[in-house]
């Protein structure tokens, strides 16, 4: 279980760093729809995105209170 928690934390760290790099860099162009969906805190759902999708598998971040809505995990 400890290995799973370590891998989960590593995954969340890498995912957040990739999103920060995509947001700040001019050379990396994230699709507007995906960028708005994952990084917009003023979304129409009124929720904070957890930074993962739930298209094929459920939200891994349900342990911190996230749930799936419109194929993106929100808290």
Swiss-Prot record:
The keyword Chloroplast does not apply. The presence of a 'disulfide through disulfide knot' structurally defines this protein as a knottin. Residues 25-45 form a propeptide. It comes from Chassalia chartacea. Disulfide bonds join 50-66, 54-68, 59-73. The keyword Signal applies. GO terms for biological process: defense response to Gram-negative bacterium; killing of cells of another organism. Expressed in fruit, pedicel, root and stem but not in leaf (at protein level). Probably participates in a plant defense mechanism. Active against E.coli ATTC25922 but not against S.aureus ATCC 12600 or S.epidermidis ATCC 14990. Has cytotoxic and hemolytic activity. Pfam families: Cyclotide. Belongs to the cyclotide family. Bracelet subfamily. Residues 1-24 form the signal peptide. This is Chassatide C8. It comes from the Eukaryota. Keywords: Antibiotic, Antimicrobial, Cytolysis, Disulfide bond, Hemolysis, Knottin, Plant defense, Signal.
């Amino acid at each position: 279980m400890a290995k799973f928690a370590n891998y989960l934390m590593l995954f969340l760290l890498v995912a957040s760093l990739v999103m920060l790099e995509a947001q700040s860099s001019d050379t990396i162009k994230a699709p507007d729809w995906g960028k708005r969906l994952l990084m917009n805190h003023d979304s129409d759902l009124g929720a904070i995105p957890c930074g993962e999708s739930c298209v094929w598998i459920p939200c891994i971040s349900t342990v911190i209170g996230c749930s799936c809505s419109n194929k993106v995990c929100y808290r």
